[in-house]
Swiss-Prot record:
The lineage of its organism: Eukaryota, Fungi, Dikarya, Ascomycota, Saccharomycotina. Residues 5-274 form the OBG-type G domain. It holds the Pfam family MMR_HSR1. InterPro entries: Beta-grasp_dom_sf, G_OBG, GTP-bd, P-loop_NTPase, YGR210-like_G4. This is Uncharacterized GTP-binding protein YGR210C.
Length: 411
């Protein structure tokens, strides 16, 4: 059974990494047990917001997930987050908590790199003015590359000799070296396919080793940039520089401290706030539902509206987790016992169970993942009781609501 996806949160000190993590993990609602068997000390549970299947069928009032929650058709799905500590220049050589940083990193399926785009903290998180946050993006990539590359080069002579003696494929040889980072053969093949004119492994020089490692990093460590502190006056110019330098990298503009502030006021009953949107209502808008705020807080909310919400459409926190799961190709799949009513059995609650699955996964593989390998699947059905083959693929809005019929055990 595949393990749950794990999103690593990285960032230098004072970048807003801890605040971002807090904003992603704040439940904001009474939530039941987690679906995960273990949560390590440096792991947390975040909540991915998606359009729930209940909204397709007008069943929002009946949607009661077993894990997470659903509000007005917005489902919040639990997902594991990893707080990756120790990010400082020189981490690859063990500086700071470098060894722990790199050991944590290899467990992550994707990274959210929190970048302070205000330019008010230097490479080590100390207060300054006019710092270029492009440096932070570059040295994170350099630290990972130097770590992987250094481990490879230390053994390169023996790697080449064994590769030649055993007549192994490049994929098999690299998998033997990269397996400790959580790689698998298809991942390595995809990384190699990106490289044009790749010579035989025994002819690789330092430049080719670097190119291979960089391509491997794109597969193993896909990264979303959380460009944080967007309400600072210097943020605009720094965001523009980053977008120009990294046009193909997924980037989301965020203000994590704003998100945490708004959620706190919402919990205390001072505002109505819909996460992931620009909408904030106060006592002046809803006097029957909300408590009044003092002028100082009201002025801060007005500034938040002007500098963040109306300008960017949201604080970006909901969107950054969506972007991380998107680069992994993960989509929600709903499993039900009754494909006609979408319930879990005899009750009236719908779409109780939801799993994150890679887009394009065969339906039969999903069935074995959910039901376990010890049962025999007699048939698989989707909306309307339509039978689907095990080879049919899961796609957004297609084969993403499934019911499994189990074959009776033979005597």
């Amino acid at each position: 059974m595949p393990r749950d996806p794990l999103i690593g949160i990285v960032g230098k000190p004072s970048s807003g990494k801890s605040t971002t993590l807090n904003s992603l993990t704040d439940a904001g609602a009474a939530v039941g047990a987690f679906p995960f068997t273990t949560i390590e000390p440096n792991q947390a549970t975040g909540y991915l917001q998606v359009e729930c299947a209940c909204s397709r069928f007008g069943k929002e009032d009946l949607c009661k997930p077993n894990y997470g929650w659903c509000s007005k058709g917005k489902r919040h799905i639990p997902i594991k987050l990893l707080d990756v500590a120790g990010l400082v220049p020189g981490a690859h050589s063990g500086r700071g908590l470098g060894n722990k940083f790199l050991d944590d990193l290899r467990h992550a399926d994707a990274l959210i790199h929190v970048v302070d785009v205000s330019g008010t903290t230097d490479a080590e998180g100390k207060n300054t003015r006019g710092y270029d946050p492009l440096n932070d993006i570059e040295w994170l990539q350099d630290e990972i590359r130097l770590w992987v590359e250094g481990n490879l080069k230390k053994r390169w002579g023996s790697i080449v000799r064994k590769h030649t003696a055993t007549k192994s494929s490049i994929v098999d040889t690299l998998q033997a070296q990269f397996g400790g980072y959580g790689s698998h053969a298809p991942m390595i093949q995809k990384a190699l396919d990106r490289l044009k004119g790749l010579p035989p492994l025994e002819k690789w020089d330092d430049e080719w080793i670097t190119r291979v490692v960089k391509s491997f990093m794109m597969e193993k460590f896909p990264t979303v940039l959380a460009l944080n502190k967007i309400d600072h006056p210097d943020a605009d110019k720094n965001v523009s520089k980053i977008m120009l330098k990294y046009p193909d990298t997924k980037a989301v503009l965020t203000s994590a401290v704003t998100e945490v502030f708004l959620r706190k006021l919402k919990k205390q009953g001072f505002i109505l706030y819909e996460e992931g949107t620009e909408f904030v209502d106060t006592f002046e808008d809803e006097p029957d539902k909300l408590k009044p705020l003092d002028d100082k807080i009201l002025n801060r909310i007005e500034n938040i509206r002007d500098l963040v919400l109306y300008r960017f459409g949201s604080t970006g926190v909901v969107q950054v987790l969506q972007a991380a799961t998107d680069i992994l190709g993960l989509i929600p799949v709903y499993t039900v016992k009754n494909i006609q009513t979408f319930t879990g059995g005899n009750g009236t609650n719908v779409f109780r169970d939801c799993f994150l699955v890679k887009r394009g996964t065969p339906v039969g593989k999903v069935a074995r993942y959910i039901m376990g390998g010890e049962v025999t699947i007699a048939s698989i059905e989707t909306v309307g009781g339509v039978r689907v083959s095990e080879e049919s693929l899961v796609e957004p809005g297609k084969n993403d609501i499934l019911g499994f019929k189990i074959a009776p055990r033979s005597a």
